[in-house]
Amino acid sequence: NAKITERHDLIGLPFIPGSSPVEFLSLSSEPGARLRATVLEFGPVLFSKMLDLNETQQGVITVIFKFCEDHELPLLDLEDLKKVLQYLTTDGKEAFEAEYGKIMTTSTGTIMRKLVELEQQGATEFFGEPSFDVEDLLRVNADGQGIVHALRLTDIQDKPKLFSSFMLQLLAEIYAIFPEEGDVKKPKLVLFIDEAHLIFDNASDALLDQIEVMIKLIRSKGIGIFFVTQNPSDIPDSVLGQLGLKIQHALRAFTAKDRKSIQKAAENFPESPYYKVDQILTELGIGEALVTALNEKGIPTPLVHCYLRAPQSRMDVLEPSEIKALNDRSPLVSKYSEVIDRESAHEILTAKLEDAQLDSHREVIQQQRTRARQEKSTMEKVFSNTTTRQIGRTVARELTRGLLGVLGVKAA
């Protein structure tokens, strides 16, 4: 490509085409290694924030998690949590309230509706086992190359809550598992979150706060995070302020609103005596960007107008046959393809409720049998009485005589 050759001659860097090992991940039925997590792994705090619950409802979720822990009821998928809610508001209500206190049915009703809403976004496929092991993201191939893991989002565009919940859980899992690294020369893992607006669109304030906290904390684990989006206004200011490296490509202004957005984006960069930032943002060409980072002292570097080198890997869409070939030889696809459906809260409580119903049915039958025996015993006593037997014989004899008299026969 003449343009690529021209660019690399200009910046003085060689262009050596090459490929990187790639594996595909998926949150749904799209081809790729299935990503799953259990309700238990989310924990009560993160799970409550995902559902956008108020303080009272969060307390209910916390107590439910505690109840399940105390009674060895694994919370693996949404069906488990729904079954626990059903149990605690029906057969198990009295025992639960005696041990953990009363919970309002309005709170459990709201939680149930939130779970149904989450299910409508495809969360049923996400919650379950086997859980994805985040250390699989650190694998290298036989040549020592790090593997690029691409999460396919082709069918997640209209499910922002599922995507944001997954990303938050992934960050939380990485923070919990990876050791402290402090400042490192290069990160051990870098996450590029494309279409970053999917995380923040319709996200609750509680969820945004949690994301901001995670971004602050995870840097000490040697993890890098890039939010990739067409417009910097897609990222909340609270999150944008946590990012040390900014690479801004051209922005185009077609409306007054666009011009205001560009002005705001320009204000997010360090002041520069060399550039009129809001103007140059609209004049950048293909493969050009404004770049600023943090130096070793944590101070933003001066703003620089850069020419970027062209990607040395393929810049094209993969054919379905190519995706299939990659998945067929992927060890992660085979590792996470089979769903594990072990006994959990749903099965345990279902069996418990069925046993309770069976015991109740047996008790009803026993009561009916007891009542029948009592009625039979009463009748037996009546007919065993001597006076009763005598009256019966007299009545029978008189009836017989009357009948024979009608027939013209004399009784003896």
What spans do the regions from the language model cover?
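Generic, well-ordered alpha-helical scaffold segments in large soluble proteins
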Residues: 64-67, 114-121, 169-177, 199, ...
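Hydrophobic alpha-helical scaffolding
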Residues: 33, 51-54, 101, 204, ...
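Conserved ATP-driven motor cores of ASCE-family P-loop NTPases powering translocation/secretion/packaging/pilus
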Residues: 1-14, 213-299
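Conserved P-loop NTPase motor module
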Residues: 34-37, 51, 247, 280-384
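Generic beta-strand/beta-sheet core signal
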Residues: 25-27, 151-154, 192-194, 199, ...
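Short, glycine-/Ser/Thr-/acidic-enriched flexible segments
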Residues: 29, 155-156, 196-197, 232-233, ...
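P-loop NTPase motor domains
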Residues: 1-213, 239, 283-284, 345
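Long amphipathic alpha-helical segments used for membrane anchoring, targeting, substrate engagement
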Residues: 363-412
